[in-house]
């Protein structure tokens, strides 16, 4: 079948045909193209637009192709795209009657329909995989509500928390990634089929019927928009880029925590490698690669935004180049999601080390200041100055949190405000105890076991929706 025969004499040069062909990345939409042609042909038959017997032959050929798979197509670049390769197959099966299949349809609306159908499936799969990862995280959190952990700001000791509390931060980030995809899905789930080249068609087609057959939620309201819009693709890539960001942050923390200096976690051997020269090494290569690969979706997003920003309505061949970047962003991010899920779920927590760090380097200092406010009605800024001086002098005196007592705090408070604060030994020791710190954070979102358990319950409601 020669699409050029009516308008042109001769063929494209081989290099021009190869340059303009989308056959290779069109393989991704093969199944959707069959669905699209099947729905369109069914509608044409029902509306009496094409001969019923010809339509039945087309549908039979499409069913046969679906069973045989993409290997049955001639994927020569001279066909330009999967649509013409598919039409060539049907033509070889039933002859010229195959031409009825393209009645009231253009490749412009056909490819948009195929991309949307395929992207819907991709988003559904990713949402399912994110929820599976969140479920794993929630189960890990349930087991670690009392596992002391150190939280950082600026990668410096900040305050004690629990490993469960930190895990639930991951879960909530992933939930938002999931919700973004759910929201984007609404804008993908629209049917452009029937837009034809750009102004619809003079045939009395039934767009609501193809919408029903293809499982879309609505018909696109404007045919020019139907064939020219790729904002849904850019939006989806953004969602995958944000998901990559979450996964990259998790990977980054695994790299840091697994170092000898931190020794908070250990990666499974399944997700580690060694050195070709240093036999003692256990390197978090998979975490590092996940962190590095998490940037790929950013590049794909910028590429697609650049492609679609400066072209006029409606269809332009530039748009052909959007889809490989869309699929690459999706595939790469899904790979990272699968790897990080497995890596985190097999992580070993060094609980002795995390408990040690939770109480080290004056991480409980904030609670000491808070106790001064609660027990002595001291302005927080005054308490902040006293505790800051306590820490500074303790460092100068080469003592740790465990060595700070009521007398030490009184001496410093005299220096700061001219009188002892007299908290008492019990209050000072309780304030500086990391476990007591954690248990006092009972507000919504806090690190106390009951607060984390509440957060887990909320997350499980989301997972079951």
Swiss-Prot record:
Xref: Pfam families: ASL_C2, Lyase_1
Molecular-function GO terms, alphabetical: argininosuccinate lyase activity
Catalysed reaction, written as an equation: 2-(N(omega)-L-arginino)succinate = fumarate + L-arginine
Pathway: Amino-acid biosynthesis; L-arginine biosynthesis; L-arginine from L-ornithine and carbamoyl phosphate: step 3/3
Keyword set, alphabetical order: Amino-acid biosynthesis, Arginine biosynthesis, Cytoplasm, Lyase
GO biological process terms held by the UniProt record: arginine biosynthetic process via ornithine; L-arginine biosynthetic process
Main location: cytoplasm
CDD domains referenced in this protein's UniProt entry, alphabetically: Argininosuccinate_lyase
Gene Ontology CC, one term: cytosol
Subcellular location: Cytoplasm
EC annotation from Swiss-Prot or TrEMBL: 4.3.2.1
Family from the record: Belongs to the lyase 1 family. Argininosuccinate lyase subfamily.
Alphabetized HAMAP family for the sequence: Arg_succ_lyase
UniProt-recorded name of the protein: Argininosuccinate lyase
């Amino acid at each position: 079948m020669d699409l050029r025969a009516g308008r042109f004499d001769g063929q494209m040069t081989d290099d021009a045909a190869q340059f303009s062909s989308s056959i290779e990345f069109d393989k991704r939409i093969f199944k959707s193209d069959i669905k699209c042609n099947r729905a369109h042909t069914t509608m044409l038959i029902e509306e009496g637009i094409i001969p019923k017997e010809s339509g039945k032959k087309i549908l039979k050929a499409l069913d046969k192709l679906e069973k045989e798979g993409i290997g049955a197509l001639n994927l020569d670049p001279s066909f330009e795209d999967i649509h013409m390769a598919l039409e060539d197959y049907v033509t070889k099966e039933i002859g010229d009657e195959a031409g009825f299949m393209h009645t009231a349809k253009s490749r412009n609306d056909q490819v948009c329909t195929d991309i949307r159908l395929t992207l819907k499936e991709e988003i559904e799969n990713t949402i399912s995989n994110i929820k599976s990862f969140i479920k794993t995280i929630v189960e890990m959190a349930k087991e670690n509500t009392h596992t002391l952990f150190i939280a950082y700001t600026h990668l410096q000791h900040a305050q004690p928390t629990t490993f469960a509390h930190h895990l639930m931060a991951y879960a909530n980030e992933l939930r938002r990634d999931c919700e973004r995809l759910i929201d984007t899905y609404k804008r993908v789930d629209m049917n452009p089929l029937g837009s034809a080249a750009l102004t619809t068609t003079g045939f009395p087609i039934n767009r609501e019927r193809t919408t029903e057959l293809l499982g879309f939620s609505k018909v696109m309201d404007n045919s020019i928009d139907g064939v020219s819009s790729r904002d849904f693709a850019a939006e989806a890539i953004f969602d995958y880029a944000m998901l990559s960001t979450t996964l990259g942050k998790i990977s980054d923390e695994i790299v840091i925590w697994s170092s000898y200096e931190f020794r908070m976690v250990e990666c499974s051997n399944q997700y580690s490698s060694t050195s070709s020269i240093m036999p003692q090494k256990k390197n978090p290569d998979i975490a590092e690669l996940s962190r590095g690969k998490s940037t790929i979706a950013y590049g794909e997003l910028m590429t697609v935004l650049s492609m679609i920003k400066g072209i006029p309505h409606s269809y332009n061949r530039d748009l052909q180049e959007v889809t490989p970047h869309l699929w690459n962003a999706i595939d790469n991010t899904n790979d990272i999601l699968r790897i990080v899920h497995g890596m985190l779920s097999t992580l070993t927590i060094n609980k002795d080390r995390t408990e040690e760090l939770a109480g080290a380097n004056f991480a409980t200092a904030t609670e000491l200041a808070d106790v001064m406010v609660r027990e002595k009605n001291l302005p927080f800024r005054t308490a902040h100055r006293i505790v800051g001086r306590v820490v500074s002098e303790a460092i100068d005196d080469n003592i740790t949190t465990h060595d700070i007592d009521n007398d030490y705090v009184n001496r410093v408070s005299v220096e700061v405000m001219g009188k002892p604060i007299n908290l008492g030994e019990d209050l000072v020791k309780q304030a500086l105890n990391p476990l007591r710190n954690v248990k006092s954070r009972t507000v919504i979102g806090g690190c106390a076991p009951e607060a984390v358990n509440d957060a887990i319950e909320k997350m499980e409601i989301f997972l079951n929706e």
